[in-house]
């Protein structure tokens, strides 16, 4: 079988490498061109780096759907397009450039979490299980029939970066099975997606990372884990001189307790002596911030322009003054509101 691989990020590399090792013919590797940053040349994507290491031809069209690119794809006379983390929706003309169309490895258990950030939204939604799906592609967004899938339990302390690395490995066997199904003309066994269960997984923004301490700790925990390593989460420490310090939060643990808010304002520090009075404790290397229904124990933080440090080291250097408090924005956090809606309102449309 003659295959065109299409992808960009590290999520695609294990499956692409398995296809390459399977002795199938790879006609070309297609990736999106990178934009230059800070006056430097464009960085090459993990897929391009992988392809060049293996001596495979690489093509980086601006749009996969323009007429010239579709004509070029057709000239390759490929049997199948294998797509993963490519970032553009293929129109019918592009899909028809290969004899069997295309399959897509997607980082969720479809139809849940259709979109650009499925792994992150699996964590944000508080899903018990995550997984991968291989679909026979249609022009809709992650809407094609499912050829095969695999699932895994999300660990309670797992962040999106760690989960994505696991899912990229989990996706290898389903991807090979999907190709084999099409080789055997077994794709009638595919399962149409029930769009009444579909949810969206839109691309995340840096502003999604601002912590709003007046939300429940379970939501803050999902936000912190779901946005690691990108775009990351942050808060602002209000300083006695009226200024504020931006603080990145790398790792934190939630503790639910309705008694906690009695000891201070939301966003304030919860002191170990107060915690002991209600039988709560945490590592002496961390600090605890009061939220709506408990505390977030900050274990690793990074003040703006500084290195990462433990919560206790941060407190000694920046939060030693009495009455210090982290900013509590007045407006709702749009990301957290979307997380709440995700649990109750299926997408219902393609």
Give, region by region, the residue ranges found by the protein language model.
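Conserved nucleotide-sugar phosphate-binding/catalytic loop shared by glycosyltransferases and other
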Residues: 31-36, 43-62
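Donor/substrate-binding cores of folate-linked one-carbon enzymes
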Residues: 21-22, 80-200, 207
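Surface-exposed, charge/polar-rich loops and edge strands
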Residues: 1, 162, 348-350
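Internal alpha/beta domain cores that form substrate/cofactor-binding pockets in large enzymes
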Residues: 2-4, 27-28, 57-76, 81, ...
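N-terminal Rossmann-like dinucleotide-binding module
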Residues: 1-42
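A residue-level signal for conserved active-site and pocket-lining positions in enzyme catalytic cores
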Residues: 7, 29, 51, 81, ...
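Structural motif corresponding to alpha-helix initiation and N-cap regions
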Residues: 13, 41-44, 66-70, 116
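Internal anion-binding site segments
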Residues: 195-350
